[in-house]
Amino acid sequence: MKSAKGIENLAFVPSSPDILRRLSASPSQVEVSALSSDPQRENSQPQELQKPQEPQKSPEPSLPSAPPNVSEEKLRSLSLSDFEEGPYGWRNFHPQCLQRCNTPGGFLLHYCLLAVTQGIVVNGLVNISISTIEKRYEMKSSLTGLISSSYDISFCLLSLFVSFFGERGHKPRWLAFAAFMIGLGALVFSLPQFFSGEYKLGSLFEDTCVTTRNSTSCTSSTSSLSNYLYVFILGQLLLGAGGTPLYTLGTAFLDDSVPTHKSSLYIGTGYAMSILGPAIGYVLGGQLLTIYVDVAMGESTDITEDDPRWLGAWWIGFLLSWIFAWSLIIPFSCFPKHLPGTAEIQAGKTSQAHQSNSNADAKFGKSIKDFPAALKNLMKNAVFMCLVLSTSSEALITTGFATFLPKFIENQFGLTSSFAATLGGAVLIPGAALGQILGGFLVSKFKMTCKNTMKFALFTSGVALTLSFVFIYAKCGNEPFAGVSESYNGTGELGNLIAPCNANCNCLRSYYYPVCGDGVQYFSPCFAGCSNSVAHRKPKVYYNCSCIERKTETTSTAETFGFEAKAGKCETHCAKLPIFLCIFFIVIIFTFMAGTPITVSILRCVNHRQRSLALGIQFMVLRLLGTIPGPIIFGFTIDSTCILWDINDCGIKGACRIYDNIKMAHMLVAISVTCKVITMFFNGFAIFLYKPPPSATDLSFHKENAVVTNVLAEQDLNKIVKEG
């Protein structure tokens, strides 16, 4: 119902516990006296507001006898339009049983479900599938790094516009749009599985030494698999469009709906759930990788998960996420523009904005014409920009490790892809979630100010920097590999898989099937010079190998059998995996403990009306300088440590087969330490520059609160009069 006093929503205006105190004075007097307390604002108001107020003759409340003047009407309508509270439902459908969802806790639950779904896909399933996608579609790590960065490119391009226009719009419905785009992106990402045909194992070729072998032809279908790169990029772009409203408008909506001291706890919980998503994604993806990629062919194939040619069903998780994401569209669209009680909560908040950015016009940012000025205003806030650069440096390494940690563990410690992904998820996800929750809890528990939250983040980053040298503490040496790091019993040259012992075998470089013999790994049984095999044994064993001198004997209940090589990689002798996992787990905790405090600091150091835009700028810069180049830099860095590339029948270089473990460890620790130092520098500089607003500066924020309080008083008074 709309009147001269504004918009009334009597059913959903929360009754104030101090209503009698607020009704003891005229509402108009409350507003005018609050506005006139600031000399600068007083000079800018119409003449009617500058007239001295006559003393009240009666303390009894009375309704205004005349319509408010133009200035008061504008201020009142502005405040009411900002806090349109309503019931939970769709159009005229508002069941009473669903109104329990119409609370900050109810919204947080739905927010967490969407954040979990987004985390499952973007930071869980995508990361755990990278190694499989590399092999299936013959891509380099730099190309799969581009796939990971495509999400951030989309986020970066849209964040400013979504955050600016969404701040004035219906935020929950923006999140319904986010759920739709996340589901669509997950669906598109799975499409290459259905159009790329059946996975070819290459079993038509003999894996043993054959002196007469037919030459293989180069088919265009093999080399064209990498063209599916563009489909993966499209899926990531759609996922980025869905993630943009979630972490800008969703975070601002949570901050709107709860008191200041609870904001960090709610935001920390939401961010922790966004990290729980990757945990589920890693576990789910790890289990799905134990299913053969072509599910219908799984029972008929004779290879096992230990076979290097094995590829898991990476695509199933994306289809499940598509269904779950779309199931959240309707629940989000049922939320009102603001939750009941938001206006009263906002009336009790105090500004902590950086002094140079505290005196923004209350009506600023309501028009598209204000966008350039709003952007310039935030870019001139030195504290805000330092915090943004700090998070960008941190995001570079966190995104890089989230993408390539399973690959690092797989190659450093000689594990299977699925087990390495499970271990990576077991370290990354619980550590990140625990860090987010601890950070938010400590900020809320001790009610830290803006400056104290920045100091807390600086401390946690320092601890993480100290422990980042774990890659040097727990690195593993390179395992012996014939023709790469080890010669063929003193013959042949390093860097050449062909030696005198296998020169007549006509081995195929495109057929990678490692075997282990005498503690040395060989590219395939053919390159080991093996001419015979026993297929019924698991694992498959080979004998009459010209490149292997010493035989290995195995005894079973039925027979004693001598062989020279067995299928699979050699067992690693490095026992530093537990040390690495424990120390890296602590590094992750302290790294993510700074996440919530920095977000809270950003929300506090800018003007109240520019928080969504501030988050949009943060995520744009964070992705431009952090999460977009992060996986690409890590991909090129890891590729630079490759010592044996896969080359197909057409002579095209594919995925890397063998890495230099020592060089990889040193390169990764160099990136980590550099980024940590940059993070701490900008964080410390923000602390040095920050100037909390003096008490007089807070008046501009309290003037808005006075108007909101006045509106609440009038609504409560009208309700009493109508009920009477």
Curated annotation (Swiss-Prot):
Disordered: annotated segments: 24-71
Membrane-protein topology: Multi-pass membrane protein
InterPro entries tied to this protein: Kazal_dom, Kazal_dom_sf, MFS_dom, MFS_trans_sf, OATP
Major localization listed first in the record, in broad terms: membrane
Extracellular-side positions: 127-145, 198-224, 296-311, 400-419, 472-580, 639-672
Keywords: Cell membrane, Developmental protein, Differentiation, Disulfide bond, Ion transport, Membrane, Phosphoprotein, Spermatogenesis, Transmembrane, Transmembrane helix, Transport
Example of a GO biological process term: spermatogenesis
Transmembrane segments: 106-126, 146-166, 173-197, 225-254, 275-295, 312-336, 378-399, 420-443, 448-471, 581-603, 613-638, 673-690
Protein purpose: Mediates the transport of organic anions such as steroids (estrone 3-sulfate, chenodeoxycholate, glycocholate) and thyroid hormones (3,3',5-triiodo-L-thyronine (T3), L-thyroxine (T4)), in the kidney. Capable of transporting cAMP and pharmacological substances such as digoxin, ouabain and methotrexate. Transport is independent of sodium, chloride ion, and ATP. Transport activity is stimulated by an acidic extracellular environment due to increased substrate affinity to the transporter. The driving force for this transport activity is currently not known.
Protein name: Solute carrier organic anion transporter family member 4C1
Gene: SLCO4C1
